[in-house]
C-alpha cells in the first residue's frame, strides 16, 4: 500500500512538472503561437477564425510552409522565417516589434498583403498582437505586441492575437533581444 501511494505521489509530481513546463494541455481549442525568446516564453492565442489571412501568413512564415524572399540575396526561401530574428524596435510603455529579417524596420518577406481589420478586434490593452505596417495594405512579416491600450492604432493595424501567458516576458524584452523560435500549437478540428 505504501509503495502504491509513493508511486501515485511520484506520478502526480511528474504530471505537475510536465504541466508547469509545457502547459499546453490546458489550452482550449484554437490556434496558438509560442515564441521562445532570449528573455523567456510568450504564448499567443491567434484569431484564425476572425482574421484568417493574417494568421495564415504568420503561421506559414513560422512553419516554413510559405515562401519568402531573402532581402539580402534576393533568393526565394521556405525556411522558418522568424527563428533567430530580433526585436528591432522597443518603445517603453508602448510596444515591442519584431519580424524584420534586416533588423532595421525596413525588411520583410518580399511581398505585401491587404489589411484585415475585424471590427471586434481592438488594441484594447496590454498583450495585443498586431501587424506592423508602413501604411494601408503594406503588411508583410513584422508584428508588434502592446504594453498597454493603443486605441489610436485601431483600424490602421490588423490585430490577430493576444498574449495569454508570458506578459512578464513581453515587459522584459529589450531592443536586440532574439526570437529564438516560434512554434505553432493546434487544438481542436478547426485549428488548421
PLM regions with names:
Residues 6-8:
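N-terminal leader/targeting segments
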Residues 2-3, 12-192:
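Cyclophilin-like peptidyl-prolyl cis-trans isomerases
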